[in-house]
Swiss-Prot record:
<keyword id="KW-0812">Transmembrane</keyword>
<feature type="region of interest" description="Disordered">
    <location>
        <begin position="1"/>
        <end position="25"/>
    </location>
</feature>
<feature type="transmembrane region" description="Helical">
    <location>
        <begin position="136"/>
        <end position="156"/>
    </location>
</feature>
<feature type="transmembrane region" description="Helical">
    <location>
        <begin position="393"/>
        <end position="413"/>
    </location>
</feature>
<feature type="transmembrane region" description="Helical">
    <location>
        <begin position="560"/>
        <end position="580"/>
    </location>
</feature>
<feature type="transmembrane region" description="Helical">
    <location>
        <begin position="165"/>
        <end position="185"/>
    </location>
</feature>
<feature type="transmembrane region" description="Helical">
    <location>
        <begin position="486"/>
        <end position="506"/>
    </location>
</feature>
<keyword id="KW-0410">Iron transport</keyword>
<comment type="function">
    <text>Major facilitator transporter that contributes to the maintenance of intracellular siderophore ferricrocin (FC) levels. Plays a role in conidiation and confers protection against oxidative stress. Also contributes to fungal virulence in the Galleria mellonella animal model system. Does not appear to play a role in either siderophore export or uptake.</text>
</comment>
<dbReference type="GO" id="GO:0010106">
    <property type="term" value="P:cellular response to iron ion starvation"/>
</dbReference>
<dbReference type="InterPro" id="IPR020846">
    <property type="entry name" value="MFS_dom"/>
</dbReference>
<keyword id="KW-0472">Membrane</keyword>
<feature type="transmembrane region" description="Helical">
    <location>
        <begin position="353"/>
        <end position="373"/>
    </location>
</feature>
<dbReference type="InterPro" id="IPR011701">
    <property type="entry name" value="MFS"/>
</dbReference>
<comment type="similarity">
    <text>Belongs to the major facilitator superfamily.</text>
</comment>
<feature type="transmembrane region" description="Helical">
    <location>
        <begin position="282"/>
        <end position="302"/>
    </location>
</feature>
<feature type="region of interest" description="Disordered">
    <location>
        <begin position="592"/>
        <end position="611"/>
    </location>
</feature>
Length: 611
């Protein structure tokens, strides 16, 4: 059964086996139907339901897909995913050197907190932007923001500029991530979605190995700045095929009169701004962004503040953040303040959705205590790995989790169940974390360390995709997008909390332990060693200073792993709380009845789906 079949509709015909027809015949038939008004009832009903402009566009575009154009679109998605994946694997190894260039190596966690905060809050509004303005337009905005972030990082002269650039970078990259998943949801059903949703992840199987090598070459022959700046050229080039695919099919839909001309907005500029405010739920977005940012960022900044937790600015940020967090559910529950809420809180009344989102939170928090953000630095300093080797070890998680997720997506398709894989994934993930604790001491062999990452990666791959699928299955058809956004937001929130707490532990313990263990004549270098990984690596392995540095790193990393072991305690109980749906009995039904074809006619793309 093919995964892609344009004739039966982008959302519901992906597994039907039907007779092949040429693209030209399909387009001629579609033109005839448009000319005779065969689709008028469907399009009119959509308009009368006040569906947002971006949704109307993609529904019209869905009617114009041919087999060739749909395949090109998916190939384009893969091409762009390959570039973003390679970029991610390359620049991951550059972060330590970029922050060290500003003598702020410890602020890696703060940078990651900024990234995770943006990742957590940007997914729901980015999906709404795509619905309000259109998929093509949203992709273009994401690419532009992405490029601006990389230009700013490459040109940054201090850690503040570098950290602020993460806002643009994270917003752009997260926008691309959610838009790719929205596009895939437009052309897949529930059983095949687990497999097709992995399409953007498949490049990791290759890029995970070549990314660190590219980073090593960039550092040796150029600079970390060029390692960031080159992607501002490569990424837009990789986006061109997808952009042309969407643009040409959008123009085809206009030519066939499937996209009606926009009516002039009523009420003037103020009315347009008011509608946009409610469409995007800007109030909810502001409260969510403020709550997450003002609570998590101070956790890593307190250690570098002059008065620590007693600093007035730190206390003020946390108090305001807590106020925004308390106000958020009241705002989102108000029909007057948020008629189109950013977060569908009522979904959390579903046991499976609540358990799945909570599981994702703790799973990703444990990841940011263990694999990110300081495992890479630990491998270089304590184990003596070079840039490429340390990068490959840390990226083993991405490689093995992708393979495991691919395997489990195929098994889900044929077993039509998902919960058993969630439970198995949680157990394997816990075993991997325990192995990381056992092998975290100096002198562990490369094979031992590699095995821990393989096991953790398999566990992550086994549980991640099935949990997302379970959360989606627990929601109604109209709420699938909201359920997906809440799942991804919960996961990013867990990562943000993990990164913030790991940064607080790191910045509190490393300087103190360096002053405790360094030889008397080197105690004055503690701040320099803490601030720059290159300074720590400058002392040869086995020297008294390096022994002291390694001891400080090992003891601090042990504390992070203890936090990871605490975070994974709820995983198995939460997996058991999820309902074991039989997925083939929960297939989504189209919102609009298909147009019947006359005998002997070619069936066009019949179903119109709202995302």
């Amino acid at each position: 059964m093919p995964f892609l079949d344009h004739r039966t509709g982008p959302s519901y015909g992906t597994i039907d086996q039907m007779e092949q027809h040429s693209d030209d015949e399909g387009e001629r038939f579609l033109q005839e139907q448009c000319d005779t008004g065969r689709f008028s009832s469907d399009i009119t009903s959509i308009s009368e339901d006040s569906v947002q402009e971006g949704v109307r566009k993609i529904e019209a575009i869905n009617l114009t897909w041919t087999a060739r154009s749909l395949v090109i679109a998916y190939v384009s998605i893969f091409l762009m995913s390959f570039c973003t994946s390679l970029e991610g694997q390359t620049v991951m190894s550059l972060g330590a050197y970029a922050t060290s260039a500003f003598s702020k190596h410890s602020l890696i966690s703060t940078v990651l907190v900024v990234q995770n905060v943006v990742n957590a809050v940007i997914k729901p509004p980015m999906a709404k932007v795509a619905d309000v303005f259109g998929r093509f337009e949203a992709f273009c905005v994401s690419i532009l923001i992405y490029v601006l972030g990389y230009i700013q990082m490459a040109a940054s002269t201090n850690v503040q500029t570098y950290a602020s650039a993460q806002i643009f970078y994270s917003a752009g990259s997260t926008g691309l991530q959610i838009l790719q998943q929205v596009f895939i949801a437009d052309s897949s059903n529930l059983l095949n979605r687990a497999f097709l949703a992995l399409l953007p992840e498949f490049p990791f199987l290759v890029t995970v190995w070549i990314g660190p090598t590219i980073a090593d070459a960039v550092l040796k022959h150029a600079s970390w700045r060029w390692g960031y700046g080159m992607w501002s050229i490569i990424l837009p080039a990789s986006f061109l095929p997808l952009a042309l695919s969407l643009l040409l099919n959008q123009r085809k839909a206009r030519r066939l009169n499937l996209i009606k001309p926009k009516s002039r907005p009523r009420g003037g500029v103020f009315a347009v701004l008011r509608r946009t405010w409610y469409d995007l739920d800007m109030g909810g977005l502001i409260l969510l962004s403020a709550a997450v940012t003002l609570i998590l960022v101070p956790l890593t900044l307190a250690a570098n503040s002059k008065n620590g937790w007693k600093s007035d600015s730190i206390v003020a940020m946390i108090v305001v953040g807590l106020f925004c967090l308390i106000a958020l559910p009241f705002w989102e529950s108000s029909k007057r303040l948020a008629p189109k809420p950013l977060l569908s809180l009522h979904l959390l009344k579903q046991r499976t959705a609540l358990a799945g989102c909570t599981l994702a939170f703790w799973y990703f928090m444990a990841f940011y205590f263990s694999v990110q953000p300081y495992f890479y630095s630990y491998l270089q300093v304590v184990q003596g790995y070079d840039v490429a080797t340390a990068g490959r070890v840390t990226q083993t998680f991405a490689f093995t989790s992708t393979i495991a997720a691919f395997a489990v997506s195929i098994l889900i398709k044929y077993t039509r169940r998902y919960r058993a894989f969630v439970i198995a994934g949680c157990v394997v993930y816990i075993i991997g974390m325990v192995l990381m604790m056992v092998t975290r001491h100096e002198g562990s062999t490369p094979a031992q360390i590699l095995v821990t990452q393989v096991v953790v990666g398999i566990g992550g791959g086994l549980l991640n995709v099935p949990v997302q699928l379970g959360v989606q299955a627990s929601a109604s058809h109209q709420e699938v997008a909201a359920a997906t956004a809440m799942f991804l937001t919960s996961m990013e929130m867990g990562g943000a909390v993990g990164a913030a707490l790991s940064g607080a532990v790191w910045t509190h313990n490393i300087p103190r332990k360096l002053r405790l263990y360094l030889p008397e004549e080197n105690k004055g270098d503690a701040d320099a060693i803490f601030g720059k990984i290159t300074k720590a690596l400058s002392y040869p392995l086995g020297s008294p200073v390096r022994v002291a540095i390694n001891q400080a790193y090992q003891e601090t990393f042990k504390k992070l792993l203890i936090l990871a072991l605490i975070a994974i305690i709820p995983l198995v109980p939460l997996s058991l709380a999820m309902e074991d749906y039989k997925l083939d009995k929960m297939s989504e039904e189209p919102l609009v009845d298909p147009v019947p074809a006359e005998e002997g006619e070619i069936e066009p793309n019949r179903h119109v789906k709202r995302t």
